[in-house]
Amino acid sequence: MTKQTEYKRKPEWLKIKLNTNENYTGLKKMMRSKNLHTVCEEAKCPNIHECWAVRKTATFMILGAVCTRACRFCAVKTGLPTELDLQEPERVADSVVQMGLKHVVITAVARDDLKDGGAAVFAETVRAVRRKNPFTSIEVLPSDMGGVEENLKMLMDAKPDILNHNIETVRRLSNRVRARAKYDRSLEFLRRAKEMQPDIPTKSSIMVGLGETREDLIEAMDDLRANNVDILTLGQYLQPSKKHLPVLKYYPPAEFAELKEIALSKGFSHCEAGPLVRSSYHADEQVRSAKEKTAEAK
């Protein structure tokens, strides 16, 4: 039995209860009516039913639904992106009002076809949400925007409450998992964000189950802390289709608990770790925890 077939069957702890109550169906209709996209749907997130039906939260995906990159773990469509929709920021802001969100996550496809990587629309979306929802905390989850400092500055000047950028995997596997992104470029992106706005918490996420070792994960944690990242999320990689990378290991909940303890011992202010954890999972709790610890440190 090979590693690839050994883990083909999902373990019990990955089975989730589907809840499609009126909150879920209502949010889905609203997204379609406003021509908005969510990473919850596009990336086939396993928590969509909990977030939409129970917590009534969602992660908006701006700049279209087509990504210029083709990372081997991701279910988002790739190809030639659509034209920029300059009305999108206002529609996102209106949706946040309609949903009554206390915390919103704004992410985007990679737009390597744009000189600014989509930074201007990203920043305007933050400002639009802030104008119409002054008490809503805002988390942004951008691509590396080509590693261009001016693009990052444009986004950070909009003053989101938290900057999230995912390294996705460990250094050893990075080129295979996300060939058009660079591990060290992502670390530099996170470091520069903290240098530009020291009071804004930074965050990153790692998927497990792609062939990494415990030592690889500890190295990645150390790399993130060396670049002043505050929050870490750890979750199980799930293969979106047979065309994507296979799952080489399903981590049990107990192992996630061990990894969380290691992460906290490294100095992360908050770590969310579990089989179904994704970057935006319980994001409102993460930002609250990080801000409380930042205040305590002053």
Swiss-Prot record:
Q: Which one Pfam family would you cite for this protein?
A: LIAS_N
Q: Which coenzyme or cofactor does it need? A: [4Fe-4S] cluster
UniProt-listed CDD domains:
Radical_SAM
Q: Name one GO cellular component term.
A: cytoplasm
| Enzyme Commission number(s) of this protein | 2.8.1.8
Protein's name in the database: Lipoyl synthase
Q: Which organism is it from?
A: Bacillus anthracis
Q: Return the cofactor note field.
A: Binds 2 [4Fe-4S] clusters per subunit. One cluster is coordinated with 3 cysteines and an exchangeable S-adenosyl-L-methionine.
Q: Where is the Radical SAM core domain?
A: 53-269
Q: Which UniProt keywords apply?
A: 4Fe-4S, Cytoplasm, Iron, Iron-sulfur, Metal-binding, S-adenosyl-L-methionine, Transferase
Pathway assignment:
Protein modification; protein lipoylation via endogenous pathway; protein N(6)-(lipoyl)lysine from octanoyl-[acyl-carrier-protein]
Compartments (UniProt record) = Cytoplasm
Q: Do you know which NCBIfam families this protein is assigned to?
A: lipA, PRK05481.1, PRK12928.1
**Top-level taxon of origin:** Bacteria
Q: Where does [4Fe-4S] cluster 2 bind?
A: 67, 71, 74
Instruction: List the Gene Ontology MF annotations in alphabetical order.
Output: 4 iron, 4 sulfur cluster binding; lipoate synthase activity; metal ion binding
Q: What is its main location?
A: cytoplasm
Extract the InterPro entries matched here.
Aldolase_TIM, Elp3/MiaA/NifB-like_rSAM, LIAS_N, Lipoyl_synth, rSAM
Where [4Fe-4S] cluster 1 binds, per the record, is at: 40, 45, 51, 280
Q: What class of enzyme is it?
A: transferase
User: What family name appears in the similarity comment?
Assistant: Belongs to the radical SAM superfamily. Lipoyl synthase family.
What reactions does this protein catalyze? [[Fe-S] cluster scaffold protein carrying a second [4Fe-4S](2+) cluster] + N(6)-octanoyl-L-lysyl-[protein] + 2 oxidized [2Fe-2S]-[ferredoxin] + 2 S-adenosyl-L-methionine + 4 H(+) = [[Fe-S] cluster scaffold protein] + N(6)-[(R)-dihydrolipoyl]-L-lysyl-[protein] + 4 Fe(3+) + 2 hydrogen sulfide + 2 5'-deoxyadenosine + 2 L-methionine + 2 reduced [2Fe-2S]-[ferredoxin]
- Gene3D superfamilies the UniProt entry points to: Aldolase class I
Under HAMAP family, the record lists: Lipoyl_synth
